[in-house]
């Protein structure tokens, strides 16, 4: 099941955001940095919405940025969507530069937020699928050719050897032989 962590200190927004997703996604809510880190470790969410204005610096973004750094260190595969105020594009851009996947500007619009969160889930799914496919090839890639079977790997190695070897006999055009 998809897992979403909502980090928001405003109880009204918490309940609105939870309402947007609770029927299709496992949702956990945290109001501050410590509870967010506890929930992150407990539920291992694929997607996290993070309000940058968290206590004790609810008017600023320092606590949100500190939490973003910790999330990216502890759960680098999670997709973080930074939630900002309408006039706060500068912090949103800074968060993207730090490694957040996307941003969403308040006020809450359930349709747009749902779209942004579902897009983040899809990106997380595609990245996981890509990691699994790479694992299935056991790193068996030769110069951009992906082969899974041992026989194909042997053919690729032979081609690689021949491609870089110098011919011992000069190549003579066909018409010179007649």
Features from the language model and the residues they span:
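Short amphipathic alpha-helix used as the core "switch/output" element in two-component signaling
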Residues: 38, 53, 57-76
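Two-component/phosphorelay signaling modules centered on CheY-like receiver
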Residues: 10-34, 42, 47
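AAA+ ATPase active-site-proximal loops
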Residues: 135-178
